[in-house]
Regions:
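Short, basic, low-complexity termini and linkers enriched in Ser/Thr/Gly/Pro
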Residues: 347-399
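Conserved Rossmann-like nucleotide-cofactor binding loop
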Residues: 14, 149, 410
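Extreme N-terminus of proteins, especially the signal/transit-peptide cleavage junction
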Residues: 1-5, 395-401
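Nucleotide/pyrophosphate-binding catalytic subdomain
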Residues: 75, 397-425
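Nucleotide/phosphate-binding catalytic cleft detector across ATP-hydrolyzing
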Residues: 1-13, 19-144, 154-349
Length: 425
């Protein structure tokens, strides 16, 4: 059943984000830093506050809610099953008269009872939501999403999400999940030693600084982007970031000048780029025809540098979705994908190898300004751009899916260029 208003949620352990789709167009995105394990009882009122902030109708019955999550990994839960159930309980308590749909890593939307029965199918599936959205416009690409804590490296082949892993342990094993992010990663988890004054200096393992301090000092993040508590409890400013960075090598600002602080920050940033670039090469080795990366997330600047280091061309998702929405990509993706599934004009296509309806063109997507700490509102598309988007979808709806062959118990998508070879065989 079609529904004009769709809310897409990305409920994480330290951030909760929502995107509002109105009539098939992205109307607004907003989010708030929120450490779930510090105040779990605040989640229900927070969901209501964010829905209101995003401009969702006040009557629950007028909104369909789609959700993806990573909050189930919080240490407050003994199992992921328990965490998934907690998040779904909170959504149903916040919006008791609304329909809730849960995004699964394989691209399905599940009703809450089914999601509770298959917790590993929906746990930490936000990467897949973004990948499914990107696949609509980029049938052969590598999605690189660097957030506050982790990096997702997802291959898209023949318009299909071709991730080797589905769960976090599988993705860590495949190189498609890298535990380094633009904000929360401790300095000692980035590098064990750094070059300083002509020597290799060991890095302390005391939690003195995090990635956000290096990127704040370098100017790649603004103080408003530093949305987690600092390691020392002092403000998120360049001055205090420099003090935290000095302690990485057990020094202080009386011992290290600005040049030395820059050496520490640059070494940490460089180590992150090198690690992500190595993971990119590993994933691309399985799909050597991929030559373009779609980059997004708070750490898009790191993703771009790593992609270029790995020899890929770069397309910022923000150029197509808007900068604000791109920072909240999983929430925006869930909302847009669910809206398309529920649209009477675009019937649902089911199955792990089916091609989703195509997304609106970049011209018809909402443009947005640089995100504020809490809320961003992309401009609504004009009626002319919506009409152009509909015409473009009609013109582009016919391209055939790349060949999908069955090998053993699995499915493999082959590039269109191999059709001729297979027909000869």
């Amino acid at each position: 059943v079609a529904c004009r208003h769709v809310a897409g949620w990305d409920v994480g352990g330290v951030n909760t984000k929502v995107a509002h789709v109105d009539g098939g167009e992205l109307a607004s995105v907003c989010g708030r830093p929120f450490e779930l394990q510090r105040a779990p009882g605040r989640l229900v009122p927070l969901l209501r506050e964010l829905a209101s902030e995003a401009g969702c109708p006040t009557r629950d019955v007028d909104v369909v809610h789609g959700v993806t999550m990573t909050a189930e990994l919080s240490q407050m839960f003994r199992t992921k099953r328990e965490g998934v159930a907690f998040v779904l309980d909170a959504l149903e308590a916040a919006f008791p008269s609304s329909e809730v749909q849960v995004f699964a890593a394989d691209g399905r939307f599940l009703a809450p009872p089914d999601a509770r029965a298959e917790p590993l199918a929906v746990a930490a599936a936000n990467w897949s939501a973004t990948a499914h959205l990107v696949a609509l416009d980029h049938p052969g690409a590598l999605l690189i999403d660097i957030g506050t804590t982790t990096t997702d490296i997802i291959p898209i082949v023949g318009g299909l999400v071709a991730a080797q892993g589905k769960t976090d342990p599988e993705r860590l094993a495949s190189g498609e999940l890298v535990y380094t992010g633009a904000l929360r990663t401790p300095a000692e988890a980035i590098a064990s030693e750094i070059p300083l004054r002509g020597e290799r200096v060991g890095v302390s393992a005391e939690g003195f600084a995090i990635a956000g301090d290096a990127h704040l000092w370098r100017g790649d993040l603004a103080p408003a982007d530093y949305t987690v508590p600092t390691p020392d409890g002092r403000p998120a400013t360049k001055e205090f970031a420099s003090e935290r960075l000095a302690r990485v090598v057990c020094a202080d600002r009386e011992m290290l000048d600005e040049t030395a602080i820059s050496l520490v920050a640059d070494a940490l940033a460089r180590a992150q780029v090198q690690r992500v670039a190595a993971a990119i090469r590993r994933v691309v080795a399985r799909h050597p025809w991929i030559d373009v990366a779609v980059v997004t997330g708070l750490g898009a600047f790191l993703a771009e540098a790593a992609a270029r280091a790995a020899g890929l061309k770069v397309v910022p998702l923000g150029d197509e979705l808007g900068d604000a929405a791109a920072r909240f990509a999983p929430a925006a993706a869930v909302a847009l994908l669910l809206a398309r599934r529920r649209s009477a004009a675009e019937p649902e296509v089911v199955g792990p190898t089916s091609r989703e309806p195509r997304a609106p063109s970049p011209e018809s997507r909402a443009a947005s300004s640089e995100p504020r700490a809490a809320s961003n509102e992309p401009r609504a598309a004009s009626s002319e751009s919506r009409a152009a988007s509909r015409e473009e979808r009609v013109e582009r709806r016919e391209p055939r899916a790349d060949l999908v062959v069955k090998i053993g118990g699995g499915l493999l998508a082959l590039p269109e260029c191999l059709d001729g070879v297979l027909s000869i065989l």
